[in-house]
Amino acid sequence: MNDYYSQGLKKRTPINSSSHYDIVNNIKNLLEKGEGTYRENCKSIDGVEENQEELFWNLCNLIGTPLSQSTQGEKILSIKNAGLSADDPKVRGPNTNQKLSFHSDRCDVIAFLCLQPARSGGENQIVQSEEVEQVIRKERIDLHSILSQKFPYKTHTIDGANPLPYCEQPIFSNRDGFFACSYLRVLIDRADQDPHCPDLNDSQKEALDFLDSVCERKELQSCFTLQKGDMLFLNNWTTLHRRTAFDDHEDSEKKRHLLRIWLSMPNSRPIDESFRRNFGAVEAGAIRGGITPSIQ
């Protein structure tokens, strides 16, 4: 959380070698022009196991621009099971031990560092969103058309500096030949349940259910479990991700613990104009996304 950011991590472990910059450029290209995923252990980059948090922070700063992930302006978020129930209005999915649904986050790239894996479970599952889109286009072109239209998203309870009750944006979109997928069903469902937000019709609900069912197809999924020191980077416009439920150790020092950073990328793609309200900018390479801090 903020304690990591306040410790001056960006100053204490400089990354200066040409090999590190080669790694940075390779990661950027893989994320935007490749499969949209990059996974590596800190030790294979730095050769040592110490200062992994600092290496992670420095690497992220070279790859892109870290964004605020809360109204407190946290740029490094500590991901642990907070013991909150699923119906708690302040709960954020990553801070539970329950299975998550496939989704994307409000940034170009999401980055994780695993400090401690769970005792069991917590498997990461990733699908290529363009592959999912192609399946839907082939099997249910009628639903594909619906998913390319705007859906209401309820403003998250943790997004306190946002005065808007909801925004509307498509799940599948294309701008200037660049595909993009953005999806977080929990906020769509919350909008549907809110009398002050637009209701979903039956066709929209069917389209969302079919999208979820396609993501469940094992042949489309890449599955693995992050181990201590593993970093994972995902392009949120070209992948959807989730993790399975997990059981923690009793020892608090051994409980599952990840760090998360949201990145705006200098080589990002242009996105549909409808994302401007939620992301702040839609042009290629623009700094966009994140959550506006309450105090600037």
Regions found by a protein language model. Give the residues of each.
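Mid-sequence acidic-hydrophobic segments that form the walls
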Residues: N58-Q69, D108, L115-A118
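Active-site environment of non-heme Fe oxygenases that use a 2-His-1-carboxylate facial triad
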Residues: M1-N25, K33, G73-K228, F233, ...
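Short secondary-structure capping/junction motifs at helix and strand boundaries
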Residues: T37-E40, G64-K75, G121-G122
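N-terminal auxiliary "cap/dimerization" subdomain that precedes the catalytic jelly-roll/cupin core
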Residues: M1-T65
